[in-house]
Amino acid sequence: MSNSLKDLMNFIPQKGKVEWIGLRPAKRAELTAVHAVEIDVEEGLKDDHYSGKSRKRQVTLILKEHLEAVAKLLGKETIDPQWTRRNIVVSGINLTALKQKQFQIGEVILETTGDCHPCSRMEENLGPGGYNAMRGHGGITAKVIQGGQLKLGDEVVLKSW
């Protein structure tokens, strides 16, 4: 393998794993943890409040390892994934390395569309300092390229053509 920056940025041997899936049943409602979800190219996550509203932000993902970092920054033992308002928690793969790339989770193919920046709700959900603790740890947004079922334990891999 070449050591050019382009080659290094396109080589992601790690495989991640889906640790948690959450759906928002209504605006400002708590996320509901589920074992599996159907994902559609046009609608995004079925039964999610944001379903069909934004093609660039159909799915939000965050790293389990970042939840652990945020918890430490806030002096907490753990952070409940639903407090971050993200749909999917994954572990074992650097989501930032997936920027501008397509990746596969189970049957589903997603494409990163940007960073998922924290909002003011983080102060409300995580407590004082929650917004700043989440900065740089908010995960990514993605659009759906190929729909299907996504479930707990599914592997997360860079899509190779």
Q: Could you describe each region identified by the protein language model?
A:
Residues 1-161:
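Metal-cofactor-dependent catalytic cores
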